[in-house]
Amino acid sequence: MQEFMNFEECSKQNTNNCKQHEKNIDENNCSCKEKKVQSKKVSSDHSSSEDNASSDINSNKAETLTLNCGDQSDNKNSISDIESNKFIPNENDFQMLKKQLNDLKAENVNLKRDLQEAHQQRTNDNLKYLADFDNFKKRITVQTNREIKYALTDFIKNILIPLEQFEKVLEMPKVDDSVKSFLLGFKMIHKQVKDILQKEGVEEIKALGVKFDPNFHYALEKISDLKQPNGINVLVLQKGFLYKDLVIKPAMVKVNEWSDKNND
């Protein structure tokens, strides 16, 4: 298209040049005629010279017209070549472009689906990690609270051993009055220690005369007394203790069990 416009401009310019050149030739011819009228007495040689000049001018005009026509012919040939090489799509080209477009659309759909799946997977992973972390915090909290709650467990277990021995000494028969006065002081100390342990959450497990419970009692001996209820602790061999809600030492008991004989 640009070359076609250039061709039109070139044609217009050549036409203008031709008109201007013809005008110049006409002016020269008029000038020559005036000179011939005014100088009729000029010699034949001078007249011959003017004729030669006029011939040269006509010859130049013919050459200029020939060149301009040649340029116009070349421009027309160039436009024809451009039009002959112009791309004209056919049905196969349209089908190929349509197939490429459909392929791109399908690829776009697949990419969107993959992106959504990746986003959903990442969301699920984040939720799983958050849930795991929340459970971990809960376990740590429970464990920490338990450790704080039962921080004195080992200490209480250790102090109960000499305390039981201390009680056995206090239960011995009193023979001498001087010993009785010492025992009275020991009883006061024993009571103070028990009060301190009780404030810390230590209490004695009830065992005598109650039904045997494997969670709190440990049977060292068994008897079969039909006069007493079945499954009852008839004797406490060693005291048991609770620290808050934790059994730090089960009660050692003798259990009355006669159900087997009774069934016989």
Curated annotation (Swiss-Prot):
Compositionally biased intervals (Basic and acidic residues): 36-49
GO CC, alphabetical: cytoplasm
GO molecular function: adenyl-nucleotide exchange factor activity; protein homodimerization activity; protein-folding chaperone binding; unfolded protein binding
Keywords: Chaperone, Cytoplasm, Stress response
Gene3D superfamilies: 3.90.20.20, Head domain of nucleotide exchange factor GrpE (2.30.22.10)
Subcellular location: Cytoplasm
UniProt cross-references to InterPro entries, sorted A to Z: GrpE, GrpE_coiled_coil, GrpE_head
Region (Disordered): 36-59
Main location as per UniProt: cytoplasm
Protein's GO biological process: protein folding
Pfam families, A to Z: GrpE
Start-end of Low complexity biased regions: 50-59
Alphabetical list of HAMAP family matching this protein: GrpE
Summary of subunit composition and partner proteins: Homodimer.
Function: Participates actively in the response to hyperosmotic and heat shock by preventing the aggregation of stress-denatured proteins, in association with DnaK and GrpE. It is the nucleotide exchange factor for DnaK and may function as a thermosensor. Unfolded proteins bind initially to DnaJ; upon interaction with the DnaJ-bound protein, DnaK hydrolyzes its bound ATP, resulting in the formation of a stable complex. GrpE releases ADP from DnaK; ATP binding to DnaK triggers the release of the substrate protein, thus completing the reaction cycle.
Similarity remark: Belongs to the GrpE family.
PANTHER family for this protein: GRPE PROTEIN, GRPE PROTEIN HOMOLOG, MITOCHONDRIAL
Name of this chain's protein: Protein GrpE
